[in-house]
Amino acid sequence: MTNPRISIVIPTAECEGKKFLPRCLNSIKSQSYINYEIIVVEEGKVAYNMNCGIKKATGDIIKILCHDDYFNGPLALEEIAIAWKGGWLVSGCVHDTGAEEFVMTHYPGWNDHIHRGFNTIGGLSVLAFENKDPLLFTEGLDWVVDIDFYKRAFLRYGLPRFLVTPNVVIGYGPHQTSFKLTEEQRTKEINLMVEKYGL
């Protein structure tokens, strides 16, 4: 597919991380690849919020980009478009601690135990997937909303296409919602994944 249209879904919420939304949007405006649409959604809990954005998407590819994350340079969307082969794609990323200091470069990989909390893919903003009867996120999950999606994407499409270029920057710090979840909630959701997919 040449020149695929990319729907960039940006879930946001009234929280501390929302202050980073302008940085996210500016990183999109600086892209050399221009066949995209931006869908900013603020509809409630994480999974429901993203699902609302997915349902509004008109592009060939749905690209998740959380409001506190941003593209790593002007070629990020073009890299996705060039690498795209259908199904799903995950990219490498770096982390920004808040002072635009990049740390912890992460290269995605697959493991069959991802549903048990061994997330070797990365955060939601590394994800792109096809907009053909698209997968939706499982509502009611917070801690494992990403790995549950990755497991179901694998079961539908097989392995993702790996874009090892770190083309996304993950905003890392205490503003992240995942830091606010209790250990009890995390354990409960991991147990749900084991019940659903096995050991």
Report each predicted region and the residues it spans.
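Short aromatic/hydrophobic "clamp" motif used to bind/position activated sugar donors
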Residues: 62
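Cell-envelope/extracellular polymer assembly enzymes that use nucleotide-activated donors
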Residues: 4-9, 37, 148
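Catalytic beta-strand/loop signature of glycosyltransferases that borders the donor
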Residues: 92, 160-168
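Short, acidic, metal-binding catalytic loop of nucleotide-sugar glycosyltransferases
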Residues: 23-35
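Acidic donor-binding loop at a coil-to-helix junction in glycosyltransferase catalytic cores
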Residues: 143-149
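Flexible acidic/His/Gly-enriched loops in nucleotide-sugar-dependent glycosyltransferase catalytic domains
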Residues: 50-51, 72-135, 174, 179-199
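Glycine-rich, basic loop-to-helix element that forms the pyrophosphate-binding segment
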Residues: 43-57
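Short active-site alpha-helical segment characteristic of glycosyltransferases
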Residues: 76, 149-153
